[in-house]
Amino acid sequence: TPSNSSAASDVYKRQVLSAIDEVDGPFAVINADDYYGRHAFEAIYNYLSEHEDDDRYRYAMVGYLLKNTVTDNGHVARGICTTNEEGELVNITERTRIEKRDGKIAFTENDGETWENLPEDTLVSMNMWGFTRSILDELKAEFPQFLKKGLTENPMKCEYFLPAVVSNLLEADRATAAVLPSTDKWYGVTYKEDKPVVVEAIRNLKKEGLYPENLWEE
């Protein structure tokens, strides 16, 4: 089932639900402080333009190659995607410690006592989702129950997880989530040492003409 903890998914639900009165069609959800690449946005746009809800909700998620999301400066947490033969999401397995080791990418589940290699082309979720407006109705419907339980059990830290709703819908066979593979490199500042790498990468994208020097120029 979709993981609740990958990247910043813990704040998604309340942010998305707060926009319910402003959203009137399909939309994408991303982490505000990450760079996802041009292809990812094109893939989400094309999918949402070509698909509508029918007997099930038709959602999508961009899957990144693991090698394009890791850092040289430490370990990261990533959601490892499992898909079916149709390329639809089956589940996301959270690996909380993945890092580069001896030229390979590996993860540990026991504080580094043992490591298991992961293929570089493993698809991972970086929390780029595409939804029809139906997800908002689902979020709204579950919110009162979340408040009742969360404010009773953990009023200071309870979080409303977006992937949990997707997971419930997939398990109930009420929705599908197409995994759209992307070869774009994902950039984020997990460690302070990552910042100059990201700055240089964005600068090079501008030099190549992929983006204007000032993104908001008319």
Which positions does each model-derived feature cover?
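A C-terminal functional module that forms or caps the active site or interfaces directly
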Residues: 139-174
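Terminal low-complexity segments of carbohydrate-biosynthetic enzymes
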Residues: 200, 204-218
